[in-house]
Amino acid sequence: MTERADTHVVLYDLGSSSADLIAAMCLGHMRVTVLEPDQADADRVRDVLQRRLPGAGFTVSTRLPEGCDVFICHASDAQMAPPASLVAVLDGPEALATAPEPDRSVAMDVLDPRFAEVAFGNAPDTTRARATRFLAKLNTGFAVTTRGHGFWGNRLQDAAISFVDRLLLIGITPWELDEALEDAGFAQGLLKSQDHIGLDVAFARRRASGTDLLVADRMVHEGRLGRSVGVGWYRYPGGGGAVIDPLMEDMIVEEARFAGIDPVPMTDAAAADAVIAGIINAAAGMLQDGMTTDGVDALAFYKLGLPDLTARAKQIGESGLRNRLTALQAVDATLWCPSPSLGLIFGS
């Protein structure tokens, strides 16, 4: 099936987390249907998306169309795809092993359309070409993921939030850490970024992998899902900009006390350096899996807002980074354990 000029894309049961993707598809002159099987969910998602994307041309529906060109969904919903459509599952390369129709399926991380990851699995050349044409219409660069569990961009995001969650528990506040991260070169604090994405997105990945985070998980359980609902790491009164929420500090202190985690003296700048060291350490595994340094830098920039990751690593130096990671093991021995692949960042 060749995509028409007005490529029709269906987003199946993705909620408001697809707002950035919808905006990019509208700019690419695609016809977008946001399909929410539950009427109450459809009404809620329509309200959120209309507020976030005023004037964007998309349809919210509860009815599955007879056909479409591209069907984007979670792997568990792939069987809902209309015949002959390209099926793009968001869960990661491993989801292709159980795809109902692997010949027309790819795995694609495209919710942040500035830079995508795609895994083709065993799809034929015709399916690969369709996926590539779709990404071209989005006007996005992309990296091809050939192996590994999950998309590397998501794994970097999840690792970064794990570092942040632990640092909050030892006494750093969310807004102080975000400010320090921006001072260190991040385009936006990681917690503000998570509010924009929606905390439920990473939470779903953690549930699937059996990973728990004390603060971030509690926030989701309490309905602090991010900007789309008006409260996450920050509050967004009237749908406006981020405002510090003093209740967050009380929640973090309570979680630390329950877990028996004592405060650790650390400056905000040192906390930001700890996050960056952890990200570099996590990124080393990407090189082991065949990613290029350019791909590593692109994913760190577009998924975390951190430019020039490999250059930052080389500026610290391999010995300096290992020493930094070793010292941070006093905060968490597992999170900051030096990767066996760390030397690849430095060409060793």
Q: Model features per residue range: what roles?
A:
Residues M1-S348:
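N-terminal glycine-rich phosphate-binding loop for ADP-containing cofactors
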